[in-house]
Amino acid sequence: MTRGKFFIFLIFSLALLLTGFALLYRYTQTHEVIAFWGPEGSQSISSPDHLELWQLVPWTDQSADLPQGSTIPIQDRQYIATKKKDVTKAPGFINASGALILNRNYNWSPRAEESDCTPAWTHALLYRRGAHTTVVAISLNCGWVYSRKANRVAGINKSVTEGLARLFQEQLGS
């Protein structure tokens, strides 16, 4: 084998090795997130066409009908949006969305560690991509997120929780 062919073979081998490493690295960074939000949900979070921030309160008026388009079911309870804001282009939400699709930012069994925390589901991020909508319900007091797809909660780390709280304060004043 001539020297030129050897270097071409070496470059292609290195490229294949690095491609395999990149795929393995990406898998380890996102596989639990994809199971939690679902493939379409993870895609919606990572690159949404539209992003809305909702401030939520529990729906307590059982005698009246739920308003259409302003409610979210979270853990067998209905929540209603008291404020809505389009934050698609708002500063900070691209980074927040990026944080929500990385495994390292989650605690996958928060109830075992913080069993005394009662979540107050006060905010939700609605990610829309095409016809698909992913709802990320957030309890800032417990540092938890809720997935309707998985019908379970997961903890988010303290820095992500604090960052989301700052963003919500800036956008909604709450």
Model features per residue range: what roles?
Residues 3-13, 19-174:
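Function-determining sites in protein domains
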